[in-house]
Amino acid sequence: MSAEGSMIVVDVSEGNIEDLCRLCVPREREDDTGFAKGMELKKAWVSGMLRRWGSVAKVAYLENTPAGLIQYVPVPDEKVVRILCIFVPHEEHWRKGIGKSLLTSLIEDMRSPKEWLGGEPPSALVTRPFPGEKPGQYPAKSFFRDMGFKQVEGDPGLLCYPLRRGFVYRPVERRGPEYVPQEDDKGKVVVIYGPSFCPWSYVFLERSVKEIKEAIPGVCVRWISSLEEPAEAEKRGIPEGIIVNARIIGTFLLNDREAFLKEVFIALGEN
């Protein structure tokens, strides 16, 4: 825990998960059923990560009000900590040093030995900032650069903050999970979902299904929760995604709606 004036930065625990999750949800949509489900899934994710790692997020409080967050996960085989996001959602809390306080607190914490690294401190913090800031909001990529993060060679979107002198970050190449086609998935839409660090993930899945239903009235949709039907999710090989006629949809709706729907139609053979 660290404090600066009327601001205090606190590690997330089971006692303040609610504060962390609510910072992710727009105030005007707190009663939205999609976000309610998304928050439920985020709470499950945080609880699981706390049991596994002990520390995965911090919340900044300004005058006792949750004002900002930073989320991160250890990556033991790379000896680094990956920052998933840093977020100060409300304009009245901007330009008050909240983001800086959150990141500074994390940097201080990660200079100490960690059990998950055999008693050694991490070698670096790494992050891949994503766009989406509101008008007038400090872009995350600019913030991290101003805080001393440097671009990783060969990857303009990846930034690194070394904690050990001379450390050069070289990401481990990984293959993402691959969908295992199922006979039961033919002729329908199947949505796999489960615990997620971001409540928007479920909202985006809902929005994608809505677009599909509007484009293809009467299409059959099956939702599979990895929490409620773990065996069904596991045999398909992916933790989250949209499957159409036993084909995984790779296009993200918000990136390109037209391309998303085209991929759906092709999967259904309705080109």
Regions found by a protein language model. Name each.
Residues M110-G136:
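Conserved GNAT acetyl-CoA-binding A-motif
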Residues V244-N271:
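Non-catalytic, surface beta->alpha helical segment in thiol-disulfide oxidoreductase systems
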Residues M1-G48, V59, P199-W200, F204-S208:
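Short amphipathic alpha-helix that is part of the acyltransferase structural core
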Residues C85-I98, P129-P131:
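A short, internal acetyl-CoA/4′-phosphopantetheine-binding micro-motif in the GNAT/acyltransferase core
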Residues W94-S112:
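Conserved acetyl-CoA-binding loop-helix of GNAT-fold acetyltransferases
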Residues V75-L84, W94, L117-G118, D184:
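A conserved beta-turn-beta hairpin within the catalytic core of GNAT-like acetyltransferases
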Residues E178-E214:
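Local sequence-structure signature of Cys/Sec-based thiol-disulfide redox active-site neighborhoods
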Residues V59, N64-P74, V80-R82:
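Conserved beta-strand in the GNAT
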